[in-house]
Swiss-Prot record:
One function term, GO molecular function aspect: telomeric DNA binding
Cross-link (Glycyl lysine isopeptide (Lys-Gly) (interchain with G-Cter in SUMO2)): K111, K191, K205, K209, K237, K366
Record protein name field: Telomeric repeat-binding factor 2-interacting protein 1
A Pfam cross-reference name: BRCT_2
GO biological process: negative regulation of DNA recombination at telomere; positive regulation of canonical NF-kappaB signal transduction; positive regulation of NF-kappaB transcription factor activity; protection from non-homologous end joining at telomere; regulation of DNA-templated transcription; regulation of double-strand break repair via homologous recombination; telomere maintenance via telomere lengthening
Highest classification ranks of the organism: Eukaryota, Metazoa, Chordata, Craniata, Vertebrata
Alphabetically ordered keywords of this record: Acetylation, Activator, Chromosome, Cytoplasm, Isopeptide bond, Nucleus, Phosphoprotein, Telomere, Transcription, Transcription regulation, Ubl conjugation
C-alpha cells in the first residue's frame, strides 16, 4: 500500500483554536461566504478553526457578507464577516445575532459588549409575533431530525429540539420546531426528496401520541452522542483537488487495537478495518454469483493490521479528527484510502462521484433493476460493485 504523505503543519499558518468553529456536540459550523476580496482570507480562518465552507447557500449554513452590501443587508439573513475576525482575535465563539446585518440599526462598533451609553437610538426590541416557516426551514428541520434522531422517542421528547434551537439552524424556538415537525412535517420527507425518516417504523403512532400529549414522552435525557455526518458534496473543506486515480486499497476487517469503531450508518452495516487488493467484480458478475457458493474469508496478517492502524492514526493526526469521524469517512467512501483522504481534505472524492448515503445503501439492497441502474448512474459501475463487496465483508 502506498505510504501516506508526511504530516506536517505550516508554522506560519493561523494560530487560533482548531475547534473554534466546532459546536458543543462535535459538529462543524458551515459557512457560505459571498464573493469578495476578503473571501480567501476568511476561508483560511474558517477552515483552520474547524469550520466548513459551502459553495452554495444551504439550510443551516451561516451566511457571511461584508457590511454595506445592499442585497445582504436587505435580506436580513446575513452575518457580518467581522464575526469571523472577532472570533479569531479573541479565540472564542461569539454570539452570531450580534453581527446580523440589516435587521436593526446598530452602533458604529458592532462588537458585542460595546457600550451603548450616549447613543440616541433606543435599544432594539426583541422580535415579537409568529415567524412564518419557509421551505428552507422545513428542510433544515427534516434534515436535522434525520441526522440526529436516533430513536422513535427522540422526536416526541424535548432534548432533540432544544439542541436544534441551540444550533441556530432557524430563528424559531424549540417548542415551535417540535410542533412544526409533529403536526406538519412528520412523514412528509418524500415531498422534500429527503428519503425516509430514521424513525419511520413508528412515526404514525408517535404522531398520534404527540398530538394528545406532546410532553408525555420527554425523558429529559439527551440521546447518545453520535458523530455528526460529514458534509455533503456541495460543502467543501477548501479548494477542490484535481481528479486522480482511485486507490484500490480497501479497509474491511476489524482491528481490536483501535477499539470499537462501529458507525451506525445503515442496518446491519459495520465498518471494519483492513486491506485487500484487486478490482472488485462488476455488478453483472456480482448478480451472477450463486447464493449457495461459500467463499473462504481471507485471513489478515499482522503486518496488514499494523499498516491499517498506522494509516488511520495518520489520518486522525493530519485532519485533527477523532477515530469515529475518520472511520465514518472510510465507511462513506467504501474503505478507499485515497478517496477518503481526498474527501477529508477537500470534501470531494478524486473521481468526482458523491459519497454514499444511508438511503442509497438501503436502495442497494433492493432487487430492482431500475434502482440499481439509478445507483450506477449516480456512483459509477465500479463504485457500485465496490460498495457491494464492501458491505458483504
Amino acid at each position: 500500500m502506498a505510504e501516506v504523505m508526511d504530516l506536517g503543519k505550516d508554522p506560519n499558518g493561523p494560530t487560533h483554536s482548531s475547534t473554534l468553529f466546532v459546536r458543543e456536540d462535535g459538529s462543524a459550523m458551515s459557512f457560505y461566504v459571498r464573493p469578495s476580496s476578503a473571501k480567501r482570507r476568511l476561508s483560511t480562518l474558517i477552515l483552520h478553526g474547524g469550520g466548513i465552507l459551502c459553495r452554495v447557500q444551504k439550510p443551516g449554513a451561516v451566511l457571511l457578507a461584508q457590511p454595506g452590501e445592499a442585497l445582504a443587508e436587505a435580506s436580513g439573513d446575513f452575518i457580518s464577516t467581522q464575526y469571523i475576525l472577532d472570533c479569531v482575535e479573541r479565540n472564542e465563539k461569539l454570539e452570531l445575532e450580534a453581527y446580523r446585518l440589516g435587521l436593526t440599526e446598530q452602533a458604529s462598533d458592532p462588537k458585542p459588549g460595546a457600550s451603548a451609553e450616549g447613543s440616541t437610538e433606543p435599544e432594539p426590541q426583541p422580535l415579537t409575533g409568529r415567524i412564518a416557516y419557509t421551505d428552507a426551514d422545513d428542510v433544515a428541520i427534516l434534515t436535522y431530525v434525520k441526522e440526529n434522531a436516533r430513536s422513535p422517542s427522540s422526536v416526541t421528547g424535548n432534548a432533540l429540539w432544544k439542541a436544534m434551537e441551540k444550533s441556530s439552524l432557524t430563528q424559531h424556538s424549540w417548542q415551535s420546531l417540535k410542533d412544526r415537525y409533529l403536526k406538519h412535517l412528520q412523514g412528509q420527507e418524500h415531498k422534500y426528496l429527503l428519503g425516509n425518516a430514521p424513525v419511520s417504523p413508528s412515526s404514525q403512532k408517535l404522531k398520534r401520541k404527540a398530538e394528545q400529549d406532546p410532553e408525555a414522552a420527554d425523558s429529559g435525557e439527551p440521546q447518545n452522542k453520535r458523530t455528526p455526518d460529514l458534509p455533503e458534496e456541495e460543502c467543501v473543506k477548501g479548494e477542490t483537488k484535481e481528479n486522480g486515480e482511485a486507490d484500490n486499497k480497501l479497509f474491511e476487517e476489524a482491528t481490536p487495537e483501535l477499539g470499537e469503531a462501529v458507525v451506525d450508518e445503515s442496518p446491519d452495516f459495520e465498518i471494519h478495518i483492513t486491506m485487500c487488493d484487486g478490482d472488485p467484480p462488476t455488478p453483472e458478475e456480482d448478480s451472477e454469483t450463486q447464493p449457495d457458493e461459500e467463499e473462504e474469508e481471507p485471513k489478515v496478517s499482522t503486518q496488514e493490521v499494523g499498516t491499517a492502524i498506522k494509516i488511520i492514526r495518520q489520518l486522525m493526526e493530519k485532519f485533527n479528527l477523532d477515530l469515529s469521524t475518520v472511520t465514518q469517512a472510510l465507511l462513506k467512501n467504501s474503505g478507499e484510502l485515497e478517496a477518503t483522504s481526498s474527501f477529508l481534505e477537500s470534501g470531494r472524492r478524486p473521481d468526482g462521484f458523491p459519497i454514499w448515503c444511508r438511503q442509497d445503501d438501503l436502495d442497494l439492497q433492493k432487487d430492482d433493476d431500475d434502482t440499481r441502474n439509478a445507483l450506477v448512474k449516480k456512483y459509477g459501475a465500479q463504485n457500485v460493485a465496490r460498495r457491494i463487496e464492501f458491505r458483504k465483508k
